């Protein structure tokens, strides 16, 4: 075989010229110790706080404690496969998650990976889970309502788009039910073509049983609400770091809508469990404990999350993110550490009580303790007009009911007040998964406050309401349409409603 020196030298020169010097450079450290979901790592000198790191077996973690000689990392997965001396490499990215409309209708974990078995999620955008809340200048005061479909809320503690309204109560008082009904009630606005009316929903489940989350997803699907909802689940069986992260993940997904001129509502169910997960992580990272063994920055944990809910002004797209955090109390103790923290951060609270729940008042809202500090400005004019007196009447009723237990000979005005109060309480009851359109709520509450149910037996109030509303829908649909389209309850509408209710009173017996 003929060997030509010139040819060989040309091949060698070509190879030298095209020699690739790109080596994969990544900063690598080694595990000093691992246990209880925490790894101590040596050698990651340039790691950032909140940065993702990757262990040799592919499990990810997040650097939280940056100390002089080592880094404390919380592990997003099982620590069983990680051992001392293993390599750990930096990813050089702060924890981020996929965001966008492709997530609607899906169930994801705290890192944004799908867990519903419907294949991968095609998103183009990612967003950091921890971002600064909008400043004061880009914000605008709350002025549009979030219709929950629950009479007790829309009339007495109205919620506006961009508000933070706490739902607080003991276990098994229907806190999640209030949130899910609010989601289901957005079905009609989300079916319209007007993007500015739509309200996308994000539900974050923290530390709940998987069966409970599956049940919630099933309820949303059956009621047609899943197609405009995202569910983020960090269940009880998952590591504490994922339970701590899940609310921030859901918030980042909700912020996508807020920052693109759309509207979203997010439910954190519940923040008590997030605080417990954060306490576990902090104690294992050897951070000093404070009150109830929570770390010193547990207030900041929740405030930086809830401050991200905002109504943006028109220069910034006019979008909004409404937050409905849920807190579970122990035996009605709202003065415990976490409940008082979250009450002071939010713009009002909806207080649910066990006693009311067992008396059959559902939703079990304590109207006296529940407030909405900014929602009044967002309430529709029609609802504001008819519900003005109901709060006062219910407050007087509760005060009188306490005294009425002692004396039997009550004067006529007190008797009237007690009768009206009992019927109004009955009127505010509502079964689960049956939110009511606001125009029907308006007529219903108008009937209650104007004496139309005073002569109806208490146990027939619900029957009266359902028959009256079906009468209005069939005979006086124009009244309902006027209220729905204008959002107002003008004198002519009022006169027509009075005439309709008088006509119905004759046939209801």
Swiss-Prot record:
It catalyses: ATP + H2O + 4 H(+)(in) = ADP + phosphate + 5 H(+)(out). The record marks 370 as: Required for activity. It comes from the Bacteria. One of its GO terms (cellular component) is plasma membrane. It is found in: Cell inner membrane. One of its GO terms (molecular function) is ATP binding. PROSITE patterns: ATPASE_ALPHA_BETA. Its EC number is 7.1.2.2. Keywords: ATP synthesis, ATP-binding, Cell inner membrane, Cell membrane, CF(1), Hydrogen ion transport, Ion transport, Membrane, Nucleotide-binding, Translocase, Transport. It is an enzyme of class 7 (translocase). It is a peripheral membrane protein. InterPro entries: ATP_synth_asu-like_sf, ATP_synth_asu_C, ATP_synth_asu_C_sf, ATP_synth_F1_a_nt-bd_dom, ATP_synth_F1_asu, ATPase_a/bsu_AS, ATPase_F1/V1/A1_a/bsu_N, ATPase_F1/V1/A1_a/bsu_N_sf. Disulfide bonds: none annotated. ATP binds at residues 169-176. PANTHER family: ATP SYNTHASE SUBUNIT ALPHA, MITOCHONDRIAL. Belongs to the ATPase alpha/beta chains family. NCBIfam families: atpA (TIGR00962), PRK13343.1 (NF009884). Produces ATP from ADP in the presence of a proton gradient across the membrane. The alpha chain is a regulatory subunit. F-type ATPases have 2 components, CF(1) - the catalytic core - and CF(0) - the membrane proton channel. CF(1) has five subunits: alpha(3), beta(3), gamma(1), delta(1), epsilon(1). CF(0) has four main subunits: a(1), b(1), b'(1) and c(9-12). HAMAP family: ATP_synth_alpha_bact (MF_01346). This is ATP synthase subunit alpha. It comes from Erythrobacter litoralis (strain HTCC2594). The gene is atpA.
């Amino acid at each position: 075989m003929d060997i030509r020196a010139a040819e060989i030298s040309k091949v060698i020169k070509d190879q030298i010229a095209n020699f690739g010097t790109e080596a994969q450079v990544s900063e690598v450290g080694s595990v000093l110790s691992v246990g209880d979901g925490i790894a101590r790592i040596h050698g990651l000198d340039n790691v950032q706080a909140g940065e993702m790191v990757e262990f040799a077996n592919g499990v990810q973690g997040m650097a939280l404690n940056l100390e002089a000689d080592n880094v404390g990392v919380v592990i997003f997965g099982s620590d069983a496969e990680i051992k001392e001396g293993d390599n750990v490499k930096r990813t050089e990215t702060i924890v981020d998650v996929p965001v966008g409309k492709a997530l609607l209708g899906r169930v994801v974990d705290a890192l944004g990976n799908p867990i519903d078995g419907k294949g991968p999620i095609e998103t183009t955008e990612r967003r950091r889970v921890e971002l600064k809340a909008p400043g004061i200048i880009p914000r605008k005061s709350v002025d549009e309502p979030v219709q929950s479909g629950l009479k007790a809320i829309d009339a007495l503690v109205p919620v506006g788009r961009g508000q933070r309204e706490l739902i607080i109560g003991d276990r098994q008082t229907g806190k999640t039910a209030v949130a899910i009904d609010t989601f289901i009630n957005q079905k009609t606005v989300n079916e319209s073509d007007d993007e500015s009316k739509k309200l996308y929903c994000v539900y974050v489940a923290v530390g709940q049983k998987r069966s409970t989350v599956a049940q919630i997803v099933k309820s949303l699907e059956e009621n047609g609400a899943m197609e405009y909802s995202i569910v983020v689940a960090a269940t009880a069986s998952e590591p504490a770091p994922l339970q701590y992260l899940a609310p921030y993940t859901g918030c980042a997904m909700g912020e996508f809508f807020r920052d693109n001129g759309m509207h979203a509502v997010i439910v954190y169910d519940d923040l008590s469990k997030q605080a417990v997960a954060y306490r576990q992580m902090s104690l294992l990272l050897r951070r000093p404990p404070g009150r109830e063994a929570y770390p010193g920055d547990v207030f900041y944990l929740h405030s930086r999350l809830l401050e991200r809910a905002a109504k943006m002004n028109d220069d910034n797209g006019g979008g909004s993110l409404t937050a409905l955090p849920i807190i579970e109390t122990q035996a009605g103790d709202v003065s415990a550490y976490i409940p008082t923290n979250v009450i002071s951060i939010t713009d009002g609270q909806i207080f649910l009580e066990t006693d009311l729940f067992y008396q059959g008042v559902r939703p079990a809202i304590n109207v006296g303790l529940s407030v909405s500090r900014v929602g009044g400005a967002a309430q529709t004019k029609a609802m504001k007009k008819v519900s003005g007196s109901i709060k006062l009447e219910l407050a007087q009723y509760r005060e009188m009911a306490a005294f009425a237990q002692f004396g039997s000979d009550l004067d006529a005005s007190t008797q009237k007040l007690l009768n009206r109060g009992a019927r109004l309480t009955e009127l505010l009851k509502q079964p689960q998964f049956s939110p009511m359109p606001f125009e029907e709520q308006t007529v219903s509450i108008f009937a209650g406050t104007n004496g139309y149910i005073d002569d109806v037996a208490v146990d027939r109030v619900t029957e009266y309401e359902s028959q009256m509303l079906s009468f209005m829908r069939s005979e006086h649909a124009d009244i309902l349409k006027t209220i729905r389209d204008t959002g107002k309850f003008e004198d002519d509408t009022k006169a027509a409603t009075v005439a309709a209710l008088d006509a119905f009173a004759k046939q209801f017996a």
